[in-house]
A protein has these predicted regions:
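Flexible, low-complexity segments enriched for small/polar residues
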Residues: 74-113, 122-344
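Short loop/turn and capping residues at structural boundaries
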Residues: 15, 120-121
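Non-catalytic, conformational "gating/processing" segments within enzyme and secreted inhibitor domains
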Residues: 1-96
Length: 344
């Protein structure tokens, strides 16, 4: 029956029809192609019937509005929206408890506010549940419950590590290399998120495909693009695949970043440096054994902490980053390879 409501609507030239509420171009109704009969819906829609008040384009639009109102009057519509929001921002799994204690109140807020999204966002993002403070059950973690999309993985790295972006006016060629070849061509294209070109009209599988959802972004075909990102940043090249030595138009100077970013309170102290980096990079701080893996095995490479302190002081005095670049590079690779870093 709903399909009958849509009969007679078609494309129109962009400038001919402007929607009065949104001020954006809209399609056009052609009454000669519309089914003006009464549309009788099932018990799931309370046996509602939709009939046109007039047999012209205004009547067609009235039917369309009636169909929209009928759909939004259903409690399940609001719940569906809120489930989609929950899976986008919190976690892919919705248990019966979450459905009753989180989704249902959000849906009620959605309906009570005439389907305005902001009150729902405020309620969700301000809840104890969102910050994983509503219980002590370690088996239902909210923080770190979502796998980053390739876009999130790349842009968060660019922002956090303060990667210098080439100026599009004075460094036009490098700007194109950075975005077209580096970000779009290598990280996103091979990472399973060819930007603006989803595989079908439903969008990217990571946002809707059950039961995996965001796990769709992390598989045997896309993992290389994710794990080669630190090498791309440190070498300033595509790092892998065709033309692996080609420049991406910029390069990450990690020693200068550690020195100048203001993130690290005492870079000379290896323990403090690793601790503060992990606090920023991971959803939650790792436990003792995991932390020691990054500090002792990766960063210090089994050497005494004093070795790093000496190398850092020497770097500050001479500007030569040869010795500090090696342990910092090991640490960056290990952190960005870590499962924890792939989570948000």
């Amino acid at each position: 029956e709903a399909a009958r409501v849509f009969t007679g609507f078609n494309l129109a030239f962009r400038h001919l029809n402007i929607d009065p509420e949104t001020a954006i171009p809209s399609g056009k109704g052609y009454p000669q192609s519309h089914d003006f009969g009464t549309k009788q819906f099932s018990v799931r829609f309370n046996n509602a019937a939709i009939s046109p008040p007039s047999q012209d384009e205004a009547g067609m639009l009235a039917e369309l509005n009636a169909l929209t109102d009928m759909i939004f009057a259903q409690e399940e519509t609001a719940r569906h929206f809120c489930r989609r929001l929950y899976r986008m921002f919190v976690h892919r799994n919705i248990t019966d408890e979450i459905e009753n204690e989180v989704i249902a109140p959000l849906a009620q807020t959605f309906r009570d506010n005439d389907f305005e999204m902001m009150p729902v966002f405020r309620q969700l993002f301000g809840s104890q549940h969102f910050f994983d403070e509503d219980d002590s059950d370690n088996a239902d973690e909210i923080v770190g419950g979502i796998i980053k999309s390739p876009l999130e993985l790349a842009l968060q790295a660019y922002a956090f590590f303060q990667i210098p972006i080439p100026d599009p006016l004075t460094q036009h060629a490098d700007y194109l290399r950075f975005y077209q070849h580096g970000l779009f061509g290598r990280v996103l294209g091979f990472g399973g998120m060819d930007l603006f070109y989803p595989p079908d009209v439903a969008g990217y599988p990571g946002y809707f495909q059950q039961p995996g959802f965001q796990r769709q972004f992390f598989n045997s075909a896309t993992i290389v693009a994710r794990y080669k990102l630190p090498q791309m940043l440190l070498t300033g090249t595509l790092a892998w695949g065709p033309n692996s030595d080609a420049s991406i138009g910029t390069k990450f100077d990690m020693a200068a970043w550690v020195r100048d970013s203001g993130i690290f309170s005492d870079p000379e102290d290896g323990y403090v440096l690793v601790q503060e980096l992990l606090d920023y990079a991971f959803p939650e701080h790792p436990d003792g054994d995991r932390f020691n893996y990054f500090l002792v095995q990766i960063f210090l490479d089994g050497l005494p902490p004093a070795d790093w302190s000496y190398e850092w002081v020497n770097y500050l005095a001479t500007g030569d980053d040869t010795e500090v670049r090696i342990p910092l590079g090991r640490l960056l690779n290990a952190v960005m390879y870590a499962p924890e870093y792939q989570l948000a």
